Design a protein with these regions (language model features):
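Acidic/histidine-rich alpha-helical segments that form the ligand environment
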Residues: 1, 33-34, 49-112
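Conserved alpha-helical segments that form or flank metal/cofactor-binding pockets of metalloenzymes
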Residues: 2-46, 108
């Protein structure tokens, strides 16, 4: 999204998405480091090709909000599994991500 916005001369939009991209990389590192700290193996699977063009910034932000809601559902599912398994360490780690998703959705919603 950042590259598409940049190509369209939308530097502010491009920067917003670039900052989000960097933040998502940090989140991935937190998950990977946590998995390693639990003496488990991190498996990185191939990522499917992603969309690279949008009709407008509004469409970009709408897609972003939709995606963030999907991520929220996945994190909530992980939190439910951790609670059910009485995995308190994972539950504790996931609290930060639950809170973070509230902010992520709000940030995308604010841009719409």
């Amino acid at each position: 999204m950042s590259m598409d916005a940049e190509a369209k001369g939308l530097k502010g939009v491009a920067n917003w998405f670039y900052v989000q991209f960097q933040e998502e990389q940090d989140h991935a590192r937190i998950f990977m480091n946590y998995i390693l700290s639990r003496d488990a193996e991190v498996k990185l699977l191939p990522i499917e090709e992603v969309r690279t063009k949008w009709a407008s910034p509004l469409e970009m932000f709408q897609d972003t909000l939709k995606h963030e809601k999907e991520v929220t559902a996945m994190i909530n599912n992980l939190a439910a599994i951790a609670a059910e398994d009485k995995d308190y360490a994972s539950s504790n780690m996931l609290v930060w991500f639950v809170d973070e998703q509230v902010e992520e959705e709000e940030s995308a919603r604010d841009m719409i």
